[in-house]
Amino acid sequence: MKCAYAYYRIDPEQASLAATRIDLLLNAMATYCSQPPRRLARCDDPTTWMETYEGIADLTTFSVALNVAVQTYNCTEFIQGERHLECFSANK
């Protein structure tokens, strides 16, 4: 199983909009994960957010669905800079 992490900085004046849209995104992506996706904020900078996706069986299908969902829910409107996506797998 694989895990994916998306991180970015939000416009603090749009935090409420960002939370609503990202929560919709996480709900849409839950079917691709064995664990519920989560939205986190950095401890020392609450404008830096991270989405965690754990237990991804098919990373290619997940990535395509995530890109579609990001566009569907307009999840770049409130981001300052770029949205970064990283993938990890457990060591064997």
Description of each model-found segment:
Residues 27-30, 71-75:
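A general structural signal for alpha-helical elements within enzymatic catalytic domains
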Residues 1-66, 85-92:
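Short S/T/G/P-rich N-terminal loop/turn motif that feeds into the first structured element of a domain
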